[in-house]
Amino acid sequence: MKDRYILAFETSCDETSVAVLKNETELLSNVIASQIESHKRFGGVVPEVASRHHVEVITVCIEEALAEAGISEEQVTAVAVTYGPGLVGALLVGLAAAKSFAWAHDIPLIPVNHMAGHLMAAQSVEPLEFPLLALLVSGGHTELVYVSQAGDYKIVGETRDDAVGEAYDKVGRVMGLTYPAGREIDLLAHEGQDIYDFPRAMIKEDNLEFSFSGLKSAFINLHHNAQQKGEVLSNQDLSASFQAAVMDILMAKTKKALEKYPVKTLVVAGGVAANQGLRERLAAEIQDVKVIIPPLRLCGDNAGMIAYASVSEWNKENFASLDLNAKPSLAFETME
């Protein structure tokens, strides 16, 4: 059988990434051009700046991905691309590049949901057994997803306000940390003590919804009041207390979901899945099901995960026409 090569594009936020996947399982290249340094001084991603950076580096990323994979343009058999959710201008850059490549080589164009990419990055660890449950935690999303089969995703619980990664960045800014703050807070948390009693919203409610705005507000108020009194609080203890509250919420809701939906596998994915505190809690508290977390290099935004998610769409011949447009608010369906 002829080898199949998927060329995948990811430009939903502030990473420009192009990857090559061979025969559904072998990731030959995963080139990522990060823009973090450009956005640090703003304390967050500036959409216009992100779009311009994507335009500047996308062609080089394509060339590097193909060279690293050791294949020519003519050997590519399909193109996969993130079409949402994300920043509209950023998405359009990846879409333009992907559609141009697919048109020029007369090969299928596969549309991929960015969050499906995060989830299916777990496929890089081992073949996934369905049905499974996924906890997706990132800068823009916090959701529990039931996956009956590859490509069939249903939200069973999600945040009512802030995403967990967003909360990390906001409290990080209050502590004077650089953007993005998640990794630094995780490191500080391991050096501090959980001495502040932050709220764990909705933790006892019999649903699978999350809320982090109350926790974020309590953190900001504590820090602000201390500043007004001239007190200096330890960033280590603040981080440890904040992270403990976040993990208590995530673990409580995940355990409830596993009780409601008996599955054999739990996938934990998204940028926050790189958090060591979360990985430690999962290892200590989830023993009855197999927990699969993508490797660190596939937790953040990258095109490799988009390639993995595109496989099920390709097998179903779920191809897009060249008028495929960006869907910045694209979301999984909610379980009825």
UniProtKB/Swiss-Prot annotation:
<dbReference type="Pfam" id="PF00814">
    <property type="entry name" value="TsaD"/>
</dbReference>
<keyword id="KW-0819">tRNA processing</keyword>
<dbReference type="GO" id="GO:0005737">
    <property type="term" value="C:cytoplasm"/>
</dbReference>
<keyword id="KW-0408">Iron</keyword>
<dbReference type="GO" id="GO:0002949">
    <property type="term" value="P:tRNA threonylcarbamoyladenosine modification"/>
</dbReference>
<dbReference type="GO" id="GO:0061711">
    <property type="term" value="F:N(6)-L-threonylcarbamoyladenine synthase activity"/>
</dbReference>
<keyword id="KW-0808">Transferase</keyword>
<dbReference type="GO" id="GO:0005506">
    <property type="term" value="F:iron ion binding"/>
</dbReference>
<keyword id="KW-0012">Acyltransferase</keyword>
<feature type="binding site">
    <location>
        <position position="169"/>
    </location>
    <ligand>
        <name>substrate</name>
    </ligand>
</feature>
<protein>
    <recommendedName>
        <fullName>tRNA N6-adenosine threonylcarbamoyltransferase</fullName>
        <ecNumber>2.3.1.234</ecNumber>
    </recommendedName>
</protein>
<dbReference type="InterPro" id="IPR043129">
    <property type="entry name" value="ATPase_NBD"/>
</dbReference>
<dbReference type="InterPro" id="IPR017860">
    <property type="entry name" value="Peptidase_M22_CS"/>
</dbReference>
<feature type="binding site">
    <location>
        <position position="301"/>
    </location>
    <ligand>
        <name>Fe cation</name>
    </ligand>
</feature>
<dbReference type="InterPro" id="IPR017861">
    <property type="entry name" value="KAE1/TsaD"/>
</dbReference>
<feature type="binding site">
    <location>
        <position position="275"/>
    </location>
    <ligand>
        <name>substrate</name>
    </ligand>
</feature>
<feature type="binding site">
    <location>
        <position position="114"/>
    </location>
    <ligand>
        <name>Fe cation</name>
    </ligand>
</feature>
<keyword id="KW-0963">Cytoplasm</keyword>
<feature type="binding site">
    <location>
        <begin position="136"/>
        <end position="140"/>
    </location>
    <ligand>
        <name>substrate</name>
    </ligand>
</feature>
<comment type="function">
    <text>Required for the formation of a threonylcarbamoyl group on adenosine at position 37 (t(6)A37) in tRNAs that read codons beginning with adenine. Is involved in the transfer of the threonylcarbamoyl moiety of threonylcarbamoyl-AMP (TC-AMP) to the N6 group of A37, together with TsaE and TsaB. TsaD likely plays a direct catalytic role in this reaction.</text>
</comment>
<dbReference type="InterPro" id="IPR000905">
    <property type="entry name" value="Gcp-like_dom"/>
</dbReference>
<keyword id="KW-0479">Metal-binding</keyword>
<comment type="similarity">
    <text>Belongs to the KAE1 / TsaD family.</text>
</comment>
<feature type="binding site">
    <location>
        <position position="186"/>
    </location>
    <ligand>
        <name>substrate</name>
    </ligand>
</feature>
<feature type="binding site">
    <location>
        <position position="182"/>
    </location>
    <ligand>
        <name>substrate</name>
    </ligand>
</feature>
<feature type="binding site">
    <location>
        <position position="118"/>
    </location>
    <ligand>
        <name>Fe cation</name>
    </ligand>
</feature>
<dbReference type="InterPro" id="IPR022450">
    <property type="entry name" value="TsaD"/>
</dbReference>
